[in-house]
Amino acid sequence: GTSINVGKRGLLAIFTCILASASLSVSCSKDDTEKTLSEETASLTVTLNGQAPRTKAVVPPEDADELEKAENTVKNATVFVFNANGTLDKRQTLAAPSLSATISGLLAGEKRVVVVANVPSSVTFPDGINYSWFADAGNVIDLDTQSPETNGLFMSGEGTVTLSANSTAATTVSVSRVAAKVKLGTITVSPEAGHDPDKFVLSRAVVMKARGSATMGLPSVNTPELFYGGMAGDKSAEKSYLSETISADDHSNRYFYVFPNDNTGGNATLITLVGTYDGQPAYFPFRINDKPGSDGATSDGTFIQRNHVYTVNVTLKRLGGGSADPEVPADPASLTVTVEPQEWATELVQNVEW
């Protein structure tokens, strides 16, 4: 099927922004002012259009293209055309390979156009859906559904247009993934004095306190406390897809999909290395993008945002000083973090030390 491919260029603009025709006025901002609806009808042609892929996937080279294609593919999409006051004018479903459709019989005037793609089968949109429905924390998708190879990664986007009576306008709506991607980068074992590397065995990388659900609109917001992890924790319900077997010599090509998390309640999403030291369990949890950088580091401290990639490079020095809890990081003063802010098609790179 036809896929919508995502490129590097443009912060928070994964697809081409709004394309305007002579009879179409477009704004990237929201206007909550109610307009008087015209009884005259208009038509709108909506298209999802992407750029050539530039993402470097974290998989073996022979599989990289397939994963990239899966992450970028739009299998289906639903277009909602809302009036300025938030009530629904019309909606229409698009299915690959045809990701463009003309919606006729619309009321003239200002519109909000919302597009959702790769919608999980568990989601049902009400017949009388309102624009505010997408911001309701009770209307969410579950992290369990975010599999590029099967369902595709959920995407959403919106724009505003003004339709003229008895004419057809055309617009291309920008969409982006709600999920973010966490990649395990390098692991360097450089033991300090008193920490015997022969007593240390590294076995797994897990994500802990990943948000279990997310709202579908822009922006995606934190939903009621539901957390998943690669192992069970005080906060996290165990999910096998958040755990990867690793060793000190074999840890490349490991990645996870997670939902946005702004550290509400102090519950930042963590990447935790799991192992043993002298036969006893040892955990090395690290908050992801948890603070602004210093001394040349460019981290922004915004934790996890939608449609970003976070690569974490880890240096382990105090092998015998791991945490006893996979959800309790070390004192932040003991961590050195370097983050390079980038979008999904690029990456945020974080270097952490234990």
Task: Name each model feature, range by range.
Residues 63-128, 181-185, 190-306, 348-354:
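Tryptophan-paired
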